[in-house]
Amino acid sequence: MRRISTLYGVVDKQAIFFSEVVIGISFNSILFLFHIFQFLLERRLRITDLIISLLALIHLGMLTVMGFRAVDIFASQNVWNDIKCKSLAHLHRLLRGLSLCATCLLSIFQAITLSPRSSCLAKFKYKSTQHSLCSLLVLWAFYMSCGTHYSFTIVADYNFSSRSLIFVTESCIILPMDYITRHLFFILGIFRDVSFIGLMALSSGYMVALLCRHRKQAQHLHRTSLSPKASPEQRATRTILLLMSFFVLMYCLDCTISASRLMHNGEPIHHSIQMMVSNSYATLSPLLLIVTENRISRFLKSLLGRTVDA
């Protein structure tokens, strides 16, 4: 009876896990294809649109890697070796770093876009896409430099018996590090994450201040408590602020679960729960952007209309 309940528990987690992957890949594909069509029609993309399309592509890669790792969590065939373990772990970390950097960069560039002409940030408004890509690479290099150890401490499980081992999947484990090395990389990771969250907080706070100032000016000019219709830049700013809030919430939840798992030497099934939480941003952020972006809604309606007419 206990085996049956355990089996049902694993099947339920597996269904949720793969549902998250399928839903996330679907939404990110829609978001990415929309920006591809926009580029083909208009022959240009705003910097923020370019970053969003890159973010969708990064999330597609993250969720694909997550699907491969899920196969070994729920249905291990014991065929994974060190190369597979290290490759998938390194690729997932690389893509997760790019996701964090792109989200941070999106917040910064939206703050620059919203800034008034008198602001010191105005001179950055018309920078080329090459500058934005270079900025992304610089942020990503900083991210990766503070966490390279993780990928190299993952190996295939060759019947290690130590209780201090942490399982990543059924076939892959994280080898324990000595006290000094572990705490050194922990401090570096905290410094890295606080730096990125701090940049997001500063740019988000700046955008909130600009929106509040614009609202007061609009109320003063129109002599009414109702502000006029928001501009596209202001609507985009509110969407990105919502995106930043969701990212920080998921990040804090991921850190809490990760700390709990490390304290209790979590099994692969516990790691799968952490993976579901850590990848929820990649799954739900495109849905948030699709729902709040009028251009995408109109594009989908016209596409569905043509399909029905055909």
Swiss-Prot record:
Membrane topology type: Multi-pass membrane protein
Swiss-Prot/TrEMBL GO biological process terms: response to pheromone; sensory perception of chemical stimulus
Residues spanning the signal sequence: none
Transmembrane residue ranges: 21-41, 47-67, 94-114, 136-156, 184-204, 239-259, 272-292
Functional description taken from the UniProt entry: Putative pheromone receptor implicated in the regulation of social as well as reproductive behavior.
Glycosylation sites: 159
UniProt GO cellular component terms: plasma membrane
Membrane side Extracellular: residue ranges: 1-20, 68-93, 157-183, 260-271
PANTHER family in the record: VOMERONASAL TYPE-1 RECEPTOR
Organism: Rattus norvegicus
Protein name: Vomeronasal type-1 receptor 90
